Amino acid sequence: MQHEDKTPEQQENKTPETELQQENAPATPQEAGAAGSIDDRIAELEAKLAEQQAAVLYAKAEGENIRRRAAEDIEKARKFALEKFSSELLAVKDSLDAALNVGSATLESYRDGVELTAKQLTAVFEKFSIVEINPVGEKFDPNKHQAIGTVESEAESNTVVNVLQKGYTLNDRVLRPALVMVAK
């Protein structure tokens, strides 16, 4: 036995750490290579982990950037949604201002100017899908009409007989219902 050849001092110098080192120490060069390949594998996996963590951080940052840009785009869309419509209405306003600045106009010229301005406004409405609701003679529709009252009429019951104020829709959505009188 090998332990018997050692002096008592050498045997006493054994500590649990040295015993553990001796037990874990590779006995052959193959085991030493395997230990090296394990270290290499650990280093490789740590590198992959760091790479994946960086990719996750990049993806998070990219997601935040997309959310921020989308919020900015929504804010701009809200802010400038009426820009085209507003610019089209400016021509109508200009026509009204021109009519008011005419010095010696006749009633007929005012009427002609108002008719032209109304045509301009109607063209703007058509361009932006604003449709007039003028339901005289139609069945009363509570989704598009607001009944102000009922009147005796020769028309069929529940039929619109008079429009007090026209209504309007925007892309088939009611902006303002028509104010109507309905037959009893």
Curated annotation (Swiss-Prot):
Segments for region (Disordered): 1-39
Disulphide connectivity of cysteines: none
Keyword Transcription regulation found: no
Keywords: Chaperone, Cytoplasm, Stress response
GO cellular component entries: cytosol
Cross-referenced InterPro entries: GrpE, GrpE_coiled_coil, GrpE_head
Basic and acidic residues: compositionally biased ranges: 1-17
GO molecular function: adenyl-nucleotide exchange factor activity; protein homodimerization activity; protein-folding chaperone binding; unfolded protein binding
Localization in the cell: Cytoplasm
Biased composition (Polar residues): 18-27
GO biological process: protein folding
CDD domains per the UniProt record, alphabetical: GrpE (cd00446)
Gene3D superfamilies: 3.90.20.20, Head domain of nucleotide exchange factor GrpE
Role: Participates actively in the response to hyperosmotic and heat shock by preventing the aggregation of stress-denatured proteins, in association with DnaK and GrpE. It is the nucleotide exchange factor for DnaK and may function as a thermosensor. Unfolded proteins bind initially to DnaJ; upon interaction with the DnaJ-bound protein, DnaK hydrolyzes its bound ATP, resulting in the formation of a stable complex. GrpE releases ADP from DnaK; ATP binding to DnaK triggers the release of the substrate protein, thus completing the reaction cycle.
Subunit and partners: Homodimer.
Family: Belongs to the GrpE family.
Protein name: Protein GrpE
